[in-house]
Amino acid sequence: MKNNYTSLKSPLDEEDELKTDHEIDLEKGLLPEYNSEEEGTLPLYSDISKLANPVPEDSSTGPTEIANPNVERRQEFKDSHPNIYFLLRLLISVLAVSVVFFTAWVCVNPLEKSIFGKVAFSVTIGITCPILFIATFCFFETWTQAVAQCIKVTVIFLAQCVKVTVIFLAQCVKVTAVFLAKCVKVIAVGLYNSKKDLVVTIWLAWVVICFILFGCVKDGRLNLNKALICSTCSISAALFFILLLVCIPIWTLKHMLFGLFQVLGVQSCVVIVTKGLMYLFDKHIDATGYEIEASSLFVIGNFLFFYEMECPGALKRMPKFIRNGIASFLEGIGNAFGGIGNAIGRIGNAFRGANDNNNNIPLEETEAESEV
């Protein structure tokens, strides 16, 4: 049998239903897609609006802002324990006034008999202390927030300073270690490539001569003066000259003489600067001072000569290396002063932010408090 089912709805009613199915509410937006597999009915428009706007809005203040947890805890403590909060403010205000009072008492007490002392003490007691008490008690939240921000910024700045200092020292240690490692490598390679027996013989002769010279100085039979300094440097340079000429023939005579004169020039500059500084400060070098100077020049001369032989042009590049080191040091100082300036700016922003937070009180809350 055929199902002769006829709809009781008129054609106009069917057209209205088709229109309402495809119409969209502009205020509520599109309907969510319906999953036929899941049980349940379609969500209501009220649920959709809650999901779309999870943050509640207030008609007067707009969207709520994320509050500071410290401020919230302070407000909760203030609301739950108003008497304790009042006593705390009063105690801190009295302590601040007491510190100022006793400071003025200690400082002005010696001048108590003079007119200036009496006026200063009267002004401190009559004007400064009441103003300080009122400011501390009434603006307790403002200045405590400012102090907290100041402490936070100071701690961050000190941590950054420590971090920069540690990094700078680590870089200095790294550069020094690399430089010393290269020097040791150069010396080791040079000694390894030379004849071992001759190296040991010349080295022992060099050490014996050094001990004889310094032993004579200790006994007083030899006055250590400029001649001894020059002779010590010359003997050391000559010994290395013979060693390098015999053992390592790749180093030409011209190159060795050029390096020797460069080293003597550096030593002469060191001696001139030392003598000039001693003359400027009206100091005289005794035997110990001459001994230290001779030992330093002895070691420096041999080291520079050997380094110049292994790395030709090293002495010419040394001023550039020194300039780069000084520039890096000055750059670090400039960065440190820049960090100090940024810290001062952050402290100012902290005070400004604390004042803005204190002034940003809604108008309706102030009106409600006035009505109460």
From Swiss-Prot:
Record flagged with keyword Membrane: yes
Membrane topology: Multi-pass membrane protein
Cellular compartments annotated: Spore membrane; Vacuole membrane
Segments traversing the membrane: 86-106, 120-140, 153-173, 197-217, 233-253, 257-277
Keyword terms of this UniProt record: Membrane, Transmembrane, Transmembrane helix, Vacuole
UniProt record, GO biological process: meiotic drive
Record's GO cellular component terms: cytoplasm; membrane; vacuolar membrane
Disulfide bridge partners, by residue number: none
Subunit-structure text: Homomer. Interacts with other proteins that exhibit high sequence similarity.
Protein family membership: Belongs to the WTF family.
Function: Acts as a suppressor component of the dual wtf meiotic drive system, and can suppress but not confer meiotic drive by compatible poisons. Wtf meiotic drive systems promote unequal transmission of alleles from the parental zygote to progeny spores by encoding a poison and an antidote from the same locus; the poison is trans-acting and forms toxic aggregates in all spores within an ascus, wherease the antidote is spore-specific and targets aggregates for degradation by the vacuole.
Record's protein name: Meiotic drive suppressor wtf18
Top-level taxonomy: Eukaryota, Fungi, Dikarya, Ascomycota, Taphrinomycotina
Gene transcribed to yield this protein: wtf18
